[in-house]
Amino acid sequence: MFGISFSELLLVGLVALLVLGPERLPGAARTAGLWIGRLKRSFNAIKQEVEREIGADEIRRQLHNEHILSMEDEARKMFAPNQPSENSPEPANPPPAPAAAEAASPVHNQAAHHEIGPAQPAAPKTELSLEKTAKPADAGTPVPAPPAHDSSLPPRAP
């Protein structure tokens, strides 16, 4: 606090021991400690009172808030050209809603519409080749969406 090193403090202690003697030195050290504590407390109280009077806390808060607001404005200016406006029109191609509705329908309701009858024989196995089934699509023509439910398959259990 005062820039006193250990050697200087030791020198002051030795001089006090020689001047006061071993009987009065502990009482003098205790009294000096109490006075130093009182001085510190009174100095801190005066410092807080002065800060309260001049409104240093309010000034600090105001400066801090102004700094934050200026940073927000700079950030808005930086990001404003990159972000689309909130009043922009909807995209021209909305996602297909009917396909999503068909896919979301429960499977057990479809099973209720099918009649349960005698077992039918399985269809004969046929060989498939990729050459016959896969044809490349043109880039300009849209590809039709696959059906949501293949009616040739038996219903799934819930």
UniProtKB/Swiss-Prot annotation:
GO terms for biological process: protein transport by the Tat complex. Keywords: Cell inner membrane, Cell membrane, Membrane, Protein transport, Translocation, Transmembrane, Transmembrane helix, Transport. Belongs to the TatB family. The keyword Protein transport applies. Coiled coil: none annotated. Residues 80-90 have a biased composition (Low complexity). Part of the twin-arginine translocation (Tat) system that transports large folded proteins containing a characteristic twin-arginine motif in their signal peptide across membranes. Together with TatC, TatB is part of a receptor directly interacting with Tat signal peptides. TatB may form an oligomeric binding site that transiently accommodates folded Tat precursor proteins before their translocation. It is found in: Cell inner membrane. This is Sec-independent protein translocase protein TatB. The Tat system comprises two distinct complexes: a TatABC complex, containing multiple copies of TatA, TatB and TatC subunits, and a separate TatA complex, containing only TatA subunits. Substrates initially bind to the TatABC complex, which probably triggers association of the separate TatA complex to form the active translocon. It is a single-pass membrane protein. GO terms for cellular component: TAT protein transport complex. Residues 73-158 are annotated as: Disordered. It comes from the Bacteria. The chain crosses the membrane at residues 1-21. One of its GO terms (molecular function) is protein transmembrane transporter activity. Gene3D superfamilies: 1.20.5.3310. The keyword Protein biosynthesis does not apply.
